[in-house]
Amino acid sequence: MGDKEMSEYYDPMLYLSAPGNANTMGCTVTLGEPIDGDILAEAAELLRERFPYFYIRVEKTENDLVPIPNPLPLTVRNTWEPIVFHTEASNYHLMAIKYEGKRLAVEILHGLTDGAGFLPYIKSLLFVYLSKKYHLSLDSTGFRLPGQEIPEAESGNPFAHLNIDAAEAPLYQKKPVKDFYRINPGDRGENHVFYVRLPEQEVMRYCRENDGSPNALMAVILARAIRKADPESEKTINITIAEYIARN
């Protein structure tokens, strides 16, 4: 794959961090008092030792993206405007922090991690920030902090045993889907909204115990419910989930 094709393929996955870009994700936290940007930046820099795999930039090679350590400071900005990853504005990082008033947000390239891998960073950032801001000695149990050993399962390459380059192209083929299952097969005027309520704590407990994602669990539950309600249909079931979760 040439440089031009590489650029067209990878650029959308590397750079823009904005609400409409599905290749990035973020977490917003609202505190009780205005954010101290200097302490927040200090906390972010301290966590570099514990989360080195988030403090990186990438180099494009002939057919791959190679992550390498990024010694430049992680950007901590007093603004709520989007930022472009892997540019001078973000110090060529694939993660950035912003704050405004009492709220802060950490944005990251989704290709680096998912929610399960991102949440420990958020928790640890808040732990260090609050400890320094209020001079607290908090129980560190359950937090990932500097000085701890980083397990291989956390930072290793799960695909190291696979020789992707040796596989013959195309790697994956799927027959085109001509039609999807529709709960409301009629005109738009006949559509209905169905509400399904699940206990949040039970859902999260199940996901943690099985190392799974709430999105995947919801998709499976809804798909199986549809199959049970209409077992004669063989149409493909498409589940779309809005990835916006607000917690007070």
Label each residue range with its predicted role.
Residues 1-61, 71-96, 228-248:
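Acyl-thioester-dependent acyl-group transfer interface
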Residues 2-5, 112-120, 124-205:
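Non-catalytic, low-complexity flexible loops and terminal extensions
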Residues 18-24, 98-100, 185-188, 198:
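Short, flexible turn/loop "capping" segments at secondary-structure junctions
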Residues 33-51, 107-123, 192-231:
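Acyl activation and transfer enzymes in specialized metabolism, enriched
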Residues 97, 104-106:
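Conserved alpha-helical substructure of the radical SAM core
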Residues 123-126, 223-224, 239-243:
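Amphipathic alpha-helical scaffolding segments
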